[in-house]
Amino acid sequence: MVRVVMTYADRWLLPEGVEEILPGEAKAIDSLRRKLLDLYSAWGYDMVIPPLLEYTDSLLTGSGRDIDLLTLKVTDQLSGRTLGIRADITPQTARMDAHSFNRQGANRLCYAGHVVHARPKNPLATRTPIQAGIEFYGEADLAADIEVVSLLLESLQVAGLPRLHIDLGHVGIYRAIANDAGLTTAQEQEFFELLQRKAVTEIHAWVEANIPSADKAAAFILLPSLAGGIEVLDRARSQFAHLPQVIDALDHLQQLAAVVMARYPSAELYFDLGEVRGYHYLTGIVFAAFAPGYGNPIASGGRYDHIGEVFGRARPATGFAVDITALSKLGFIGQHDVSAIAVEVNQDPQQWAAIKALRARGERVIQLTPAGQLAELKCDRQLLLLDGKYQVVPLQ
């Protein structure tokens, strides 16, 4: 039998893409998490805490193949069934809205917590990001989409982003073009993958091989290039005037943009009508927020009206999730240096009362021990008995 010798380095090693968060960053992340949840509460969103793992039968239902691939799966030792560790909290809130609430009208939910990815979304991403987000159930009107996009911009402001930049699209545009061309499910999936990669050369070759009608082929060729400022909507409107579903989607984007730009004049709105992220479960607008120096979205969301259908309660729904961990890595929320008050504890009741009063005010009071190092404890003040009264003075 081969004996494996473990070194200290082996015991310290974490799985690839899994990280620990040390105090300075942890405090910054938790501070932003609290600010976001307070923001969502102020807008009427109720916090929920979904379980970290569920049966895959419910966790992955209606969420699309991309979430399935991201989900880490294990066998439940009690039931023998397959469990999934959540890779996305949205399907969980959809189940909760359908099963755990008795609200017939609008239901606003928010959350914050870890998700776990079986593989990183990109080479620099963590597999254990911390997300915060909202879900708005029961409202199909444009007003709900406006509220959600507005709240995303508010979230970016709270996070301290120097620029507010959002990409907007609508999956209904590609869906209408695909239906008009009579694509099979397999063809729709093939072109979806090419469009997602913006593989222009391959798109031209695929269209030539699969779309015999010149008019319909032109729509597929045009789609990847429909990206830019709000003028893109007018360009698309002239090209797809014969497709009512596309015009409806463009009207929806135009009206949403008008309100959002009036509310947040400094925000940059970029329209990508070939954006099909989440195509398999999203049904309307799709959006993502980007930050300088980071090539992947720091937040994303959209409308997904049919996700609750599999739980027996189809409800309109829209929402987003913010990647708090990514924001921390980018340095926008900054690390919090915490100062503290040192004290040599004795049995004086007056001293204990002073310590309790300081802690009640939010001060960090640390008892000195023989092994304690003031520099490591980050103490910059001390509690001393002066003139018969315990007072906080600068550390000598």
Curated annotation (Swiss-Prot):
Asked if the Swiss-Prot or TrEMBL record annotates the protein with the keyword 4Fe-4S, the reply is no
Annotated GO MF terms? histidine-tRNA ligase activity
**Which SUPFAM superfamilies does the entry link to?**
Class II aaRS and biotin synthetases
Keyword flag DNA-binding: no
Q: Which gene encodes it?
A: hisZ
Mention any Pfam family matching this sequence: tRNA-synt_His
Transmembrane segments in this chain: where? Answer: none
Q: Its annotated pathway? A: Amino-acid biosynthesis; L-histidine biosynthesis; L-histidine from 5-phospho-alpha-D-ribose 1-diphosphate: step 1/9
Q: What else is known?
A: This function is generally fulfilled by the C-terminal part of HisG, which is missing in some bacteria such as this one.
Protein name as it appears in the record: ATP phosphoribosyltransferase regulatory subunit
Q: How does it assemble?
A: Heteromultimer composed of HisG and HisZ subunits.
